[in-house]
Amino acid sequence: MELATLVTLFLSGLLISFTGYALYTAFGQPSQQLRDPFEEHGNELK
């Protein structure tokens, strides 16, 4: 394969991996540990 093809595949894989990890963090099991600032200060905004 050419160098440009390998670089493109590497960067595409990196982007897909990062996106998958971000989705897992936002909606998967670790999301239970995230705090919700709107829920903490919900009464102050009214």
Swiss-Prot record:
Disulphide connectivity of cysteines: none
Principal place of residence: plastid
Presence of keyword Kinase: no
A GO BP annotation: photosynthesis
Single GO cellular component term: thylakoid membrane
Chain segments annotated as transmembrane: 5-27
Coiled coil: none
Keyword flag Chloroplast: no
Signal peptide feature range: none
InterPro entries, per the entry: PSII_PsbN (IPR003398)
Membrane topology classification: Single-pass membrane protein
Keywords, in A-Z order: Membrane, Plastid, Transmembrane, Transmembrane helix
Cellular compartment(s): Plastid membrane
Family: Belongs to the PsbN family.
Job of this protein: May play a role in photosystem I and II biogenesis.
Name the UniProt record assigns to this protein: Protein PsbN
